[in-house]
Amino acid sequence: MINTDFYLVELLVRNHPGVMSHITGLFTRRAFNLEGIFCTQIGDGSTSKMFLLVKNDFTLEQIIKQLEKLYDVLQVSLHQDYDYSIFQNLDKVLKIK
């Protein structure tokens, strides 16, 4: 199921305490709701991939520019056409009851 009402923001970030707080705080300060968050370390653990599910909004472009300026954010990708069912079935994949 492809969903165009939401965007998937994919981030490559440095992995250390406080990174997620800095990133989510940027959204909070702009009263922008995160619909979903998934984060996992990759490689040797020095970096992580974060996936943020957000509604299509006119302020998103400005937030992306601000994310790119954060020291701990190494890469930002914005995906409009993605399979939304990934987030719907994540609880089954992770075996969350």
Residues of each region from the PLM?
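A conserved regulatory-domain signal marking ACT and ACT-like small-molecule sensing domains
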Residues: 1-97
